A protein has these predicted regions:
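Conserved Class I SAM-dependent methyltransferase catalytic core
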Residues: 16, 23, 32-45, 238, ...
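Accessory, often C-terminal, charged low-complexity segments
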Residues: 281-303, 310, 343, 348-351, ...
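Conserved S-adenosyl-L-methionine
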Residues: 173-277, 282-292, 297-301, 332-333, ...
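Active-site lining segments that contact anionic ligands and/or coordinate catalytic metals
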Residues: 271-272, 308-310, 324-330, 355-356, ...
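Hydrophobic alpha-helix feature that most strongly marks membrane-spanning transmembrane helices
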Residues: 217, 246, 280, 319-322, ...
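Extended hydrophobic-aromatic, low-complexity segments
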Residues: 284-288, 328-329, 338-342, 358, ...
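Non-catalytic, mostly N-terminal accessory regions of nucleic-acid modification and defense proteins
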Residues: 1-194, 253-266, 360-363, 381, ...
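Hydrophobic alpha-helical scaffolding
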Residues: 128, 148, 202, 230-234, ...
Length: 522
């Protein structure tokens, strides 16, 4: 029941925002809609959190402390001067200078909150020259939205919704800007990033970081033990990520600027304990033929081909892993069996004992693409060792010559009409199998299950030409074995005969009616 209520809330919020954007028609280029709406949405979101905190301060300490910044800082809430508060904006919504007031509000918020440096648009609304009446109508629509949602990556989700509407018009790729919450949760639950450096080389709106920190907090961990590093190529998305993290009090190093991870790596010397990523799928011409050929990230491997960046992303991730680092990332299924240079790199990864698990995900998990997707798990140290993790000891067995394959295509529940999501129960089943397989005593806690999971040896993978397609290893039941085809065909024969008889009767009835009307069909 709780999930249904939440879904309805998210849908109504998205629909309201889309309705809001539609009010801009004729005043702003469609490609600008999302930026106009999202900055105002952020302003309302920040204001609502500020007012909530302000009321608590007044109730606890009295009115005279209501405008003391330290009280807001310690609660990870942005301090908003009066001219930056949503109430002030709404009260002045119909004024001729409302665009200037919005720009001033955003500038003042950034000036008063160092964590937002470089995150908010500068003099944006004044430059757009939006019709005052349409801007007032937009503000009124956004004012109706309830931003009180503590469980979802709201800003990222809303941003993704807008991207899905404009992706084709703007020439963007599909799926790389936002990763559905259930997938991020699955990756976090498998990797368990309780303590260390967490990195995302293509962080989008920062959703991976948001859900990872929530995972740590949900398991009584300390988010201060997690250091976050990320990089994002698109400037507007880079700003959004800074907003998304800052508004939740999450400290992060996203580099000096928005930049291409391959050609302008913002974290060249970084070694991460955990890497989570959803790179652009099948990115073409990601480098020139003579570019990056001697890049140190490819050391020990073939140079990834220019035709597809998938293995460029994989090797970038491998190069960033610490001695005991583990990575979970998404790629299109083609990367599992590509030939040529990709095959050579894949063989090297397997021979270097880096591939830990390959998990096929259900279709229709993403809002912007129905492409089939795989979750890869790489582990820099698959040897036997004992690790203390969030106050508990984990005894890992040696898995260097094994790879776990899983197929989740029969999992998932309907979500938002044509989409599906991996439920909490689905994820618990997957993570339980994965963690049991990793640890000592797995003989008692893990077993290969037809159509679900299989632990393959290095020799098996080698015999199959180093393909990582799960269906080459997982046993699938032949559901046709017990079918009596003669009986089945006779049954179908009878049904077809009955349908043909009915068709002839219907045809005769129709001809008779037309004849009686004087419009006979010869």
């Amino acid at each position: 029941m709780a999930r249904t209520a939440k879904t309805k809330k998210e849908i109504s919020m998205e629909e309201a925002l889309w309705k809001s954007a539609d009010k801009l028609r004729g005043s702003v280029e469609p490609a600008e809609y999302k930026h106009v709406v999202l900055s105002l949405f952020f302003l309302k979101f920040a204001s609502d959190k500020f007012e909530e905190c302000r009321n608590k301060i007044i109730a606890t300490h009295g009115e005279k402390y209501a405008d003391m910044k330290p009280f807001y800082t310690q609660e990870n809430v942005f301090y908003l001067p009066e001219e930056s508060r949503w109430k002030y904006i709404i009260e002045n919504a119909k004024q001729d200078d409302i665009a200037l007031k919005i720009d001033t509000a955003l500038y003042t918020i950034e000036k008063n909150n160092p964590a937002l440096k470089g995150a908010l648009p500068d003099n944006y609304y004044s430059r757009l020259h939006i019709d005052t009446a349409k801007l007032a109508s937009l503000l009124d629509e956004i004012n109706r939205i309830n931003t009180d949602d503590k469980e979802n990556d709201i800003i990222g989700r809303v941003y993704e919704y807008f991207l899905s509407k404009f992706a084709l018009a703007e020439g963007k790729g599909k799926g790389e800007f936002y990763t559905p919450k259930c997938i991020v949760n699955l990756i976090a639950e498998m990797l368990e990033p309780y303590d260390g450096i967490l990195y995302d080389p293509c962080c989008g709106s920062g959703g991976m970081f948001v859900q990872s920190i929530k995972f740590v907090e949900a398991h009584s961990g300390n988010k201060k033990k997690v250091s976050i590093y990320g990089q994002e190529y698109t400037n507007t998305t880079f700003k959004l990520a800074k907003m998304n993290l800052a508004i939740r009090g999450i400290s992060a190093n996203l580099g000096e600027m928005a930049a291409n991870t391959f050609t302008n790596d913002q974290h060249k010397d970084l070694k991460a304990d955990f890497i989570m990523a959803n790179p652009p799928f099948n990115q073409k011409q990601w480098r020139a033929e003579n570019e990056l050929v001697d890049d140190p990230r490819w050391n020990g491997y073939e140079v990834p081909p220019t035709s597809n960046a998938n293995y460029g992303w994989i090797l970038n991730i491998v190069s960033k892993l610490s001695q005991n680092g583990v990575a979970g990332f998404l790629l299109a299924n083609g990367a599992l069996s590509d030939d040529g240079t990709e095959l050579k790199i894949r063989q090297q990864l397997i021979e270097n004992h880096l591939v830990e698990a390959i998990i096929i995900l259900p279709r229709n998990l993403f809002y912007t693409t129905d492409i089939s997707v795989t979750l890869w798990v790489l582990n820099k140290n698959k040897k036997a060792r004992v690790v203390e993790q969030n106050g508990k000891l984990k005894r890992y067995r040696n898995r260097e010559d094994e790879i776990l394959f899983m197929d989740l295509r029969q999992m998932g529940s309907p979500y938002e009409k044509k989409y599906i999501e991996l439920t909490e129960e689905d994820r618990a089943k997957v993570t339980s199998v994965y963690h049991n397989w990793q640890q000592e005593g797995y003989e008692e806690t893990y077993e290969n299950v037809p159509e679900f999971c299989y632990s393959a040896s290095f020799e098996e993978v080698k015999e199959k030409g180093f393909t990582l397609v799960p269906s080459r290893y997982i046993e699938f039941v032949n559901r046709d074995e017990n079918i009596d085809f003669d009986t089945k065909m006779k049954s179908l024969q009878g049904e077809l005969k009955e349908l043909l008889v009915q068709e002839e009767k219907s045809k005769a009835d129709l001809l008779k009616v037309m004849e009686e009307l004087g419009y006979g069909i010869n």
